Amino acid sequence: METSHENRIVVIGSGPAGCTAALYLSRANLAPLVIEGNQPGGQLTITTEVENYPGFPDGILGPELMDKMRRQAERFGAVFKMETLESVNLTQHPFTVTTDTGQAYKCEALIIASGASAMQLGLDSERELQGYGLSYCATCDGFFFKGKEIAVI
């Protein structure tokens, strides 16, 4: 059964971009609703040490950083729903966002911050090698491989 809710702005995704959008929107008294998706907190929740984020000179664990970002947005009024997007109807205004729970959220504006995911190679040993030389983020991990021979696929 579908239930409809009115929201001014809906944010799809709860990673760094989604949480930042939620923070700024909530501070502007726009009461955003954040649909977290299938990986609440985004890719950073499966990242160990984050050393390239400003304000944390000694680094911070990915899940801890995302928890802080979420709590900060919630403090100003953002509402997070642990639901996954099923469909979006942009043909009529207000827009309608429907989730896996059957909830339908109507909104005046929609921010899509659904993030990205690493493309897996499909190797048998791939999971074991993560964190031991196998990297999916040149920006994040390039520093660790300076002066070493590498392969880019």
Task: Identify the function of each model-found stretch.
Residues 1-12, 28, 33, 80-148:
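FAD-binding core/adjacent interface of flavoenzyme oxidoreductases
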Residues 2-3, 7-76, 148:
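Beta1-alpha1 glycine-rich phosphate/pyrophosphate-binding loop at the start
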Residues 149-153:
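Short beta-strand and adjoining strand-loop segment in the mid-core
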